[in-house]
Amino acid sequence: MNRYKIVSLVLAIALLASLTHLMVSQDEGHGCAKKCSAESKSGVVLQNILSRKSVRSFADRPVSREQIDTLLRAAMAAPTGRDMRPWKFVVVEGRAEMDSLAQRLPYAKMLTEAAAAIIVCGDMSVTDSHGKPSTNWTFDCSAATENLLLMAEAMGLGAVWTGVHPYEERLVAVKSALGLPEHIVPLNVIPIGYPKGEPHPKDKYDASNIHYNRW
């Protein structure tokens, strides 16, 4: 084999080695990108969950219809037993209506400062394919509420869960104030707005509450 052929062969082998290394690096990089992306996404989600807090003091700043719609889209993405979706939502924006609710509900006085409120309700007329009403509406509506609260946190808004169901006097007050039909039961009232000040979340993690395999 002459010198020219030897040099060509060496160059070809070197080129092949370089291409192989490049392909392996790209595969590893692609795998890392997918892994890093997943880790980044999970980190953002966890941080948002851990940052959520109950906000009871609000700045004098409006919340747009687009923001409310985003909150409701998040709420209705919640899990629901047998896909029955027994939830209904009442959005209150008027100052007079907000103040009226605040007067009627002892634990929702912050409505006088909030920009809006969303009342999460269960629809007792919703039935499954066998005509049976939902027995899990409180679970489904609670899941929707938590989605809403987490979305509010992610959007820089503040919100707080104020309970209505199963307290009879609160049920009567909210149904009367909002003109709810008999088959609509309010689970809670969620005041919404921009936080006043810098409220801080509570670290509620407690390893003693965890059991593996059995108690």
Show which residues each predicted segment covers.
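Acidic, surface-exposed loops and disordered segments
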Residues: N2-W215
